[in-house]
């Protein structure tokens, strides 16, 4: 993959002389400090990491055609699985009247909520990047976008599946057993070549932003199946087939944002055929007080409830949880922001605490800080395997 | 039963009211005159259809430290409603590609969406922050939002001459209680009804900011646009200068270029 990226990069370089504004790049240096010793002797303590991302775009044909190319790479000090490269985007777009045709690798987002993204299913999560699932791998596709007076319609055909990334044996923030990423199992006989499809309708009706989506294909979230290979216990990712109906809605009124995401799923499940149907919901609000104490500072309160009908060992972390957070926006020249969030499980009381802050330094740098804590992690809780992975991260990014 | 004491009080009250009543009639004429000026200024800017422009923002703090932003802007004039606009951020580089869509309304709260390119996510945002700063500058959201006659009540103050131009001075009071201002004092020239200066008074009626316009050019033989807008905050010593470039009118934009779907493609 990196060789292919370099090849494309050099092929596109002559184009860059047309308009320098079409290239934008960033280099990041990330330092993570783990507060506790690792659970496994193969894992390491503090970690350094370097990232590079570049974006090139070019419009021609009076803006009717566009190509976008976004390569990404990370070099990690300890985790060979976290050292990886990805083509975030490489697509061509042609616009015909009210319809856009896209061919290539794209990244897109569906949904409205803050603490969990249920409806967003097109792109696979790049979980070695971050646990929060907001970093995504590029998805190869042919897609159409059609805008009409009754809403926007999108149709996707995805001929190649992307496997989820997992930390390697030396990486932190992983289950006690390593995920064997070279031996992923698929329900479909077509494996990663299964052609997934999706349809989405979205519309703005006054103060409402609504979306309805349908997905048919390989579930992005694998089940991790314990297997003993040559005496070593490993986790095999098993990707089942999934049909998913998604609903997302936001109601915006004055300082209130009311948000809801709902999914109804049907898995063809080889391991537990009685657990084929499930549903999940995340919903709540964000309220903002503007101009606190006659300053420019805004403070927001976020509250979201997360529910998933799957229980037992199928239950995801967010199955009966409440997330409460606060967003501080200074509205200063450096765009300083801070988001603090606590997600608590209402059954088992484990807590996930997250702090994210960022600020611009000068005109071409930014600094961000992230801290994650896993608390009340009793052996029966879903965060048990992360009990020693509390960390503080400092990220310095240079844009050019 | 009215006794003498009450009678005296009544007389006093009536006496106090009389000059007020006289002033009120005069006031009504001043309100009417103020509104006429605002309507005429608005009428002269009607029918531009759509426009695009580039914008450089220079933010300065009281120590003279400077920070710059490059933006591009597309506006679509709407009949019987506020304008629709898309603003695209080119610098600072960490927010490059961020785009802002607004549907402004004459009296209702504006509709606003923000496109975040790193996540490819469009967020509908609450528009109640009209008094809040736009991109950390001295311009509030309500200062850059489309100016509609209905957003204020008016009062004609007097005529004034400066820079060899004759001006009307009017006061305009925002109708919306969420506005950050008690009133704005506006200088418009008599010849072309162009705004040259606005004094912004905060909710305590203390002078907060002054905006001056400079280097006006006329487009399509009718529409005047200033190349320079300078906002000075008297209370903090900070200032923001806007340098406008590349004005272009009647580009043939339609409503379909000002949608959530189009926002994701904006460059």
Where are these regions (language model features)?
Chain B
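Boundary at the C-terminal end of the N-terminal hydrophobic targeting segment
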Residues: 22-26
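Short amphipathic beta-strand and strand-loop transition segments with alternating hydrophobic
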Residues: 73-77, 155-161, 215-216
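Bacterial N-terminal signal peptides that target proteins for export
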Residues: 1-11
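Gly/Pro-enriched, hydrophobic low-complexity segments
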Residues: 90, 101-103, 111-115, 121-125, ...
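Short, solvent-exposed mixed-charge patches
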Residues: 266-267
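N-terminal mature ectodomain segment of secretory-pathway/periplasmic proteins
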Residues: 34-118
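A short, amphipathic edge element
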Residues: 35-36, 67, 144-156, 205-210
């Amino acid at each position: 993959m990196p060789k292919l990226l370099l090849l494309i990069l050099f092929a596109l370089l002559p184009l860059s002389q047309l308009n320098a504004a079409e290239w934008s790049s960033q280099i990041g240096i990330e330092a993570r400090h783990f507060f506790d010793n690792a659970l496994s002797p193969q894992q390491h303590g503090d970690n350094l990491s370097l990232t590079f991302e570049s974006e090139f775009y070019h419009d021609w044909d009076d803006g009717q055609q566009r190509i976008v190319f976004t390569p990404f790479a990370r070099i990690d000090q300890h985790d060979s699985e976290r050292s990886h490269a990805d083509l975030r985007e490489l697509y061509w777009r042609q616009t015909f009247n009210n319809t856009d045709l896209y061919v290539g690798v794209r990244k897109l987002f569906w949904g409205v909520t803050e603490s969990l993204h249920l409806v967003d299913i097109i792109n696979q999560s790049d979980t070695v990047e971050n646990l929060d699932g907001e970093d995504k791998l590029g998805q190869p596709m042919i897609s159409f976008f059609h805008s009409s007076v009754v809403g926007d319609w999108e149709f996707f055909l995805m001929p190649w599946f992307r496997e989820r990334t997992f930390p390697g044996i030396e990486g932190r923030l992983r289950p006690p057993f390593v995920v064997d990423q070279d031996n992923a199992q698929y329900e479909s006989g077509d494996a990663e070549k299964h052609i997934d499809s999706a349809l989405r309708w979205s519309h703005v009706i006054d103060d409402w932003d609504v979306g309805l989506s349908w997905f048919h294909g390989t579930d992005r979230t694998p089940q991790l199946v314990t297997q003993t290979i040559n005496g070593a216990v490993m986790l095999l990712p098993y990707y089942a087939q999934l049909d998913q109906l998604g609903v997302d809605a936001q109601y915006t009124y004055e300082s209130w944002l009311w948000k809801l995401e709902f999914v109804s799923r049907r898995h063809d499940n080889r391991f537990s055929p009685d657990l084929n149907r499930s549903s999940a919901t995340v919903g709540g609000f964000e309220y903002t007080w503007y101009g606190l104490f006659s300053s420019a500072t805004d403070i927001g309160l976020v509250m979201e409830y997360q529910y998933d009908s799957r229980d037992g060992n199928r239950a995801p972390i967010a199955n009966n949880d409440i997330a409460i957070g606060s967003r501080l926006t200074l509205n200063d020249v450096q765009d300083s922001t801070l988001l603090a969030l606590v997600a608590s499980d209402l059954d088992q009381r484990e807590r996930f605490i997250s702090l994210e802050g960022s600020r611009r330094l000068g005109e071409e740098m930014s600094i961000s800080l992230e801290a994650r804590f896993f608390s009340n992690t009793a052996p029966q809780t879903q965060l048990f395997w992360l009990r020693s992975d509390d960390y503080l991260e400092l990220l310095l990014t240079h844009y050019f | 039963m009215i006794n003498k004491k009450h009678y005296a009080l009544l007389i006093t009250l009536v006496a106090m009211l009389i000059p007020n009543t006289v002033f009120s009639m005069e006031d009504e004429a001043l309100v009417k005159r103020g509104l006429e000026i605002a309507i005429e200024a608005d009428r002269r800017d009607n029918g531009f259809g759509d426009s695009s422009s580039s914008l450089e923002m220079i933010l300065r703090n009281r120590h003279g430290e400077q920070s710059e932003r490059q933006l591009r802007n597309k506006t679509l004039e709407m009949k019987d409603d506020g304008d629709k606009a898309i603003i695209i951020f080119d610098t600072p580089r960490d927010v490059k590609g961020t785009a802002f869509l607004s549907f402004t309304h004459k009296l209702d709260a504006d509709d606003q969406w923000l496109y975040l390119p790193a996540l490819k996510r469009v967020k509908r945002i609450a528009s109640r922050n009209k008094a809040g700063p736009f991109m950390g500058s001295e311009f509030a959201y309500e200062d850059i939002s489309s100016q509609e006659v209905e957003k204020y009540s008016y009062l004609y103050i007097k005529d004034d001459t400066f820079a060899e131009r004759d001006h009307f001075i009017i006061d305009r009071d925002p109708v919306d209680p969420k506005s950050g201002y008690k009133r704005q004092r506006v200088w418009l020239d008599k010849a072309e009804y162009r705004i040259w200066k606005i004094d912004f008074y905060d909710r305590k009626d203390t002078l907060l900011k002054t905006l001056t316009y400079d280097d006006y050019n006329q487009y399509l033989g009718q529409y005047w646009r200033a190349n320079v807008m300078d906002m000075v905050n008297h209370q903090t010593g900070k200032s923001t200068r806007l340098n406008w470039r590349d004005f272009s009118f009647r580009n043939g934009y339609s409503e379909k270029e000002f949608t959530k779907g189009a926002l994701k493609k904006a460059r």
